[in-house]
Amino acid sequence: MQETSIKRAGASAAASAAPAATVPATASASARKLYIRTFGCQMNEYDSDKMADVLRGDQGLELTDNPEDADVILFNTCSVREKAQEKVFSDLGRVQHLKKLNPDLVIGVGGCVASQEGEAIVKRAPYVDVVFGPQTLHRLPELIRRRRASGASQVDISFPEIEKFDALPPPRIEGATAFVSIMEGCSKYCSFCVVPYTRGEEVSRPFDDVLVEVADLADQGVKEVTLLGQNVNAYRGPMGDTGEIADFATLLEYVHEIPGIERIRYTTSHPKEMTQRMVDAYANLPKLVSFLHLPVQAGSDRVLAAMKRGYTTLEFKSVVRRLRAARPGLTLSSDFIVGFPGETEEDFDKTMKLIEDVGFDTSFSFIYSRRPGTPAADLVDDTPQEVKLRRLQQLQALINAQAAAIAQAMVGTRQRLLVEGPSRRDPNELMGRTENNRIVNFPAPARLIGQMVDVIITDAYPNSLRARVADVDGLAQGNA
């Protein structure tokens, strides 16, 4: 689970493998203030930015780093892991005392835990003022007004489908990267997953709406967009009044033609719906980056069937082979669950073999966590915790070794970066990201921020690379 205190309104597109960025707030001392803490995935980060946009536009709230300064405190939650759920209630307890210091303080809980728990949150934490789901964040101003008018906690965890996108204000951009949500929900109903129950069924944004948003972002200087959805391959966007439906490959083709957009990323995808048209996109669309997050979850067909993933290991490998034939050098990240109910040592060995055969640059790997209301919750969780921990450590060690080998192979190569801002390691240096999602730190002047720059990789580290500028308008190599 990732978590971050959101301190900005514009979304910089962080990699799925990277921790969320922390950017200082710029609120004036006199402005009413908003504090948002975000748990979980990139969709939640996107939603948190939208919460900030909505409340800034309607109530003039500006973001703050400090919950003690806030007039509104929001927790945007994740229910994928059990500990993440409990973490929310722990953090709620830490801000409860602020109500005594500021009786007008509004405390809200949004996201997937809110969608799953609803009224139960208020029963467990009666000082919570508003509870809202991922599909109702645009109603936050009205929920807050109702709370202040009535004195009663407000709960809205409905699924109003496309209404959210129609109601959200235009994004305020800071930087050359941005998230664009193209759909919500998931209809796959994997046996372990709560997403269909917390975010609803798959609902796609209209095709033209997505293109207009991306074009507007490009006009504001955005060069890289990350298209977001729980399962972007399932995108089926209505094309105006034509009665036609655009699939995800079609959307990518049109986004690719928008002037000013130089890179396209997307997450998350489902192996079952990686169509040949999607594979062909990697051969035909050079702006589509050479990096793909493709969750496999396990390498045992028996476990995959129990998870209701809808594919076999051979089918997954076939998808990977076709992708790499279309785009040589494509790197992959993935998701893995160890200790799924009934997973044997043989099943786990098959997962390790899959990793060895395919090769991954990074992964989100977890010990299975029982989620109430899912089909897998009824299965017997019969793997001892120490065995789960050992398997997780083995799996992560193998993927770390593969990632290190990929990084080392990049030393001496020329890479094209989008420069995102100052380096976190050294504010006198810059940080950019390669096509395959590697963070690169290098000395260069600040005027390069937001630009595409060629560098030569000089060193590889566990979580980043180091480089020197190859050539920028006569800039001396390695010169800051």
UniProtKB/Swiss-Prot annotation:
GO terms for cellular component: cytosol. One of its GO terms (molecular function) is 4 iron, 4 sulfur cluster binding. Keywords: 4Fe-4S, Cytoplasm, Iron, Iron-sulfur, Metal-binding, S-adenosyl-L-methionine, Transferase, tRNA processing. It is an enzyme of class 2 (transferase). It is found in: Cytoplasm. Residues 172-405 form the Radical SAM core domain. [4Fe-4S] cluster 1 binds at C41, C78, C112. Its EC number is 2.8.4.3. The keyword Iron-sulfur applies. Pfam families: Radical_SAM, TRAM, UPF0004. PROSITE patterns: MTTASE_N, MTTASE_RADICAL, RADICAL_SAM, TRAM. Residues 32-149 form the MTTase N-terminal domain. Binds 2 [4Fe-4S] clusters. One cluster is coordinated with 3 cysteines and an exchangeable S-adenosyl-L-methionine. Its main location: cytoplasm. [4Fe-4S] cluster 2 binds at C186, C190, C193. It catalyses: N(6)-dimethylallyladenosine(37) in tRNA + (sulfur carrier)-SH + AH2 + 2 S-adenosyl-L-methionine = 2-methylsulfanyl-N(6)-dimethylallyladenosine(37) in tRNA + (sulfur carrier)-H + 5'-deoxyadenosine + L-methionine + A + S-adenosyl-L-homocysteine + 2 H(+). Catalyzes the methylthiolation of N6-(dimethylallyl)adenosine (i(6)A), leading to the formation of 2-methylthio-N6-(dimethylallyl)adenosine (ms(2)i(6)A) at position 37 in tRNAs that read codons beginning with uridine. Monomer. Belongs to the methylthiotransferase family. MiaB subfamily. This is tRNA-2-methylthio-N(6)-dimethylallyladenosine synthase. It comes from Bordetella petrii (strain ATCC BAA-461 / DSM 12804 / CCUG 43448). The gene is miaB.
